């Protein structure tokens, strides 16, 4: 490589990103990790983290009797698969629930972001009915399931990544792995740009009127 050839650096996932138009700052990954250092509720098998939206673990997902007794209508399994939380439509065939499975591994290298929008849409559709109760589970109810719930709050409840984390931490002890946090951070940047574009379009329309 010639000496004067510029070296392209990879984007730093740990650096904060500031939107110059709104002043909103998407925190760096390290700053997001620090949010989990503070106290959180005692670990339980399942917690309601948003109205009618629950995060739970494998024990919760496997207990069909309790799911039916407590009125759950939708289950999003973020650890679907034979070697994970092996449930599915057939497992729940004796109770009335709608099932959605995501085959995800709790690894920093796993691309969970490919499921952010489909999972968020499933949750949104379920919560459109006031009588629905949604369980989002994985093995421990701390990383995969929590990340999908955070993405839902960001996409459909218009929360920032920090707001969504703080909302869930009020009710449940969660700890998404570092790779998932980076992907949620990227989603935050993307959503901030989309919202700015929507605001710019609205302002332009007002001027045209």
Swiss-Prot record:
Claim: Repressor is one of the keywords in the record: no
Entry-linked SUPFAM superfamilies: (Phosphotyrosine protein) phosphatases II
GO cellular component: cytoplasm; nucleus
Active site, UniProt feature: 138
Gene3D superfamilies recorded: Protein tyrosine phosphatase superfamily
UniProtKB keywords: Cytoplasm, Hydrolase, Nucleus, Protein phosphatase
Location of this chain's protein in the cell: Cytoplasm; Nucleus
Catalytic activity, EC: 3.1.3.16, 3.1.3.48
GO terms (BP aspect): protein dephosphorylation
Main location per the UniProt record: cytoplasm
Domain named Tyrosine-protein phosphatase: residues: 44-193
Catalytic reaction annotation: O-phospho-L-tyrosyl-[protein] + H2O = L-tyrosyl-[protein] + phosphate; O-phospho-L-seryl-[protein] + H2O = L-seryl-[protein] + phosphate; O-phospho-L-threonyl-[protein] + H2O = L-threonyl-[protein] + phosphate
Single GO MF annotation: protein tyrosine phosphatase activity
Residues given in the record as substrate binding sites: 137-144
Entry similarity comment: Belongs to the protein-tyrosine phosphatase family. Non-receptor class dual specificity subfamily.
Role, per record: Dual specificity phosphatase able to dephosphorylate phosphotyrosine, phosphoserine and phosphothreonine residues within the same substrate, with a preference for phosphotyrosine as a substrate. Involved in the modulation of AMPK and MAPK1/2 signaling pathways.
Protein's UniProt name: Dual specificity phosphatase 29
Organism this protein belongs to: Xenopus tropicalis (Western clawed frog)
């Amino acid at each position: 490589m010639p000496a004067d050839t510029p070296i392209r650096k990879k984007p730093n996932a740990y650096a904060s990103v500031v939107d110059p138009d709104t002043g909103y700052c998407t925190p760096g990954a390290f700053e997001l990790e620090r949010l989990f250092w503070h106290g959180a509720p005692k670990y339980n098998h399942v917690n309601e983290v948003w109205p009618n939206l629950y995060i739970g673990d494998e024990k919760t997902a496997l207990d069909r009797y309790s799911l039916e007794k407590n009125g759950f209508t939708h289950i999003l399994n973020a650890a679907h698969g034979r070697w994970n939380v092996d449930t599915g439509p057939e497992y729940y065939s004796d109770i009335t629930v709608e099932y959605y499975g995501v085959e995800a591994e709790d690894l920093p290298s796993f691309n969970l972001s490919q499921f952010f929008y489909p999972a968020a849409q499933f949750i949104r559709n379920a919560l459109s009915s006031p009588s629905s109760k949604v369980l989002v589970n994985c093995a421990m109810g701390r990383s995969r399931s929590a990340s999908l719930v955070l993405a839902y709050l960001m996409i459909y409840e218009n929360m920032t990544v920090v707001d969504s984390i703080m909302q869930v931490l009020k009710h449940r002890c969660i700890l998404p792995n570092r790779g998932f946090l980076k992907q949620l951070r990227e989603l935050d940047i993307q959503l901030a740009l989309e919202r700015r574009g929507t605001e710019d379009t609205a302002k332009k329309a007002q001027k045209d009127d």
